[in-house]
Curated annotation (Swiss-Prot):
This protein's pathway: Protein modification; protein ubiquitination
Protein name: Speckle-type POZ protein
Domain of life: Eukaryota
Mutation effect (residue 25 to A): In NSDVS2; dominant-negative, increased BET proteins stability
Lineage: Eukaryota, Metazoa, Chordata, Craniata, Vertebrata
The keyword Transcription regulation belongs to this UniProt entry's keyword annotation: no
GO molecular function, one term: molecular function inhibitor activity
Alphabetical list of SUPFAM superfamilies matching this protein: POZ domain, TRAF domain-like
Residue span of region Important for homodimerization: 186-217, 297-355
């Protein structure tokens, strides 16, 4: 649940008159999402009104509101027999009622949201009550392989729920002597030191190019640089560091992050930047690179990204790559990247197969709970 924001200063709310007192009302909304995959969808019983329910879910471990999704594969009634019906059901509720908006969509073979439908307002739910769409999607369109909505005969539904909580009022009075504290510009100011090479005390040599930097900042941000300058190493004695395995453009992006906490060109060089972040123990930059690479996972590059993640101990990226390969196994196994990995990294192939087997055979063990970014 997000923290209630402070109200904007009255002088910034309007260029008009300023009242002596004010009130700011925040209506709290808890948002969460749920993904439900139905394997072997074409084998569902086709009687009209037949119901399939998901397991229950909530916004978190401490949330007492429990929900589930309900599907009628062949419609709810005679009117909707040519459609799939989809509903959000409130299973248990400690209150007399709650209000919530919802959005349903289908994830296609690429994991993209399609055929989205959402409620136009927050509906009133009581325990045992459901709301949804009797005519969510035509069955003939859903079952047509050309539309790519049932890869490997799996129907994957994605649901986003927004639950309306209580409202909170914050009130106060205006004073004539309003003090406005300026925003912190530390990142910009440190970035200026790097860009202008002011007050530098060490030189970093990268592929024949020299960059002036500040030992204190490098040591504070990177345990690797800290070790170089702290001990009686040649880098500490000469205040000069030779860097041979990072390209200059990648190095500059890494230094921008060290000084400012930002990497504006990360998406263009996420793979190389991940390697640099791993070498210099820049954990936050490493996770930022993992996130960017996750966003660009595809059938063509899944094997290469899995190898990269394994090489640099990028655990979150590795998990996402394995899950992606499992979901698109029939396509990924035909790529040149996968065939190369079979020869060069057989242990990763074995890991992917083990994960695929456990996903398809849940009876082999208890269900695993899916539970950071600093």
């Amino acid at each position: 649940m997000s923290r209630v924001p402070s109200p904007p200063p009255p002088a910034e709310m309007s260029s008009g008159p300023v009242a002596e007192s004010w009130c700011y009302t925040q209506i709290k909304v808890v948002k969460f999402s749920y993904m439900w995959t139905i394997n072997n969808f074409s084998f569902c019983r086709e009687e009209m009104g037949e119901v399939i329910k998901s397991s229950t879910f909530s916004s978190g471990a401490n949330d007492k509101l429990k929900w589930c999704l309900r599907v009628n594969p062949k419609g709810l009634d005679e009117e909707s027999k040519d459609y799939l019906s989809l509903y959000l059901l409130l299973v248990s509720c400690p209150k007399s009622e709650v209000r919530a908006k919802f959005k349903f969509s289908i994830l296609n073979a690429k994991g993209e949201e399609t055929k989205a439908m959402e409620s136009q307002r927050a509906y009133r739910f009581v325990q045992g009550k459901d709301w949804g769409f009797k005519k969510f999607i035509r069955r003939d369109f859903l079952l047509d392989e050309a539309n790519g909505l049932l890869p490997d005969d799996k129907l994957t539904l994605f649901c986003e729920v927004s639950v309306v909580q209580d409202s909170v009022n914050i009130s106060g009075q205006n004073t004539m002597n309003m003090v406005k504290v300026p925003e912190c510009r530390l990142a910009d100011e440190l970035g200026g030191l790097w860009e202008n090479s002011r007050f530098t005390d060490c030189c970093l040599c990268v592929a024949g190019q020299e960059f002036q930097a500040h030992k204190a900042i490098l040591a504070a941000r990177s345990p690797v640089f800290s070790a170089m300058f702290e001990h009686e190493m040649e880098e500490s004695k000469k205040n000069r560091v030779e860097i041979n395995d990072v390209e200059p453009e990648v190095f500059k992006e890494m230094m921008c992050f060290i000084y400012t906490g930002k990497a504006p060109n990360l998406d263009k060089m996420a793979d190389d930047l991940l390697a640099a972040a791993d070498k210099y123990a820049l954990e936050r930059l490493k996770v930022m690179c993992e996130d960017a690479l996750c966003s660009n996972l595809s059938v063509e590059n899944a094997a290469e990204i899995l190898i990269l993640a394994d090489l640099h101990s990028a655990d979150q990226l590795k998990t996402q790559a394995v899950d992606f390969i499992n979901y698109h196994a029939s396509d990924v196994l035909e790529t040149s990247g996968w065939k190369s990995m079979v020869v060069s990294h057989p242990h990763l192939v074995a890991e992917a197969y083990r994960s695929l087997a456990s996903a398809q055979c849940p009876f082999l063990g208890p269900p695993r709970k899916r539970l950071k970014q600093s």
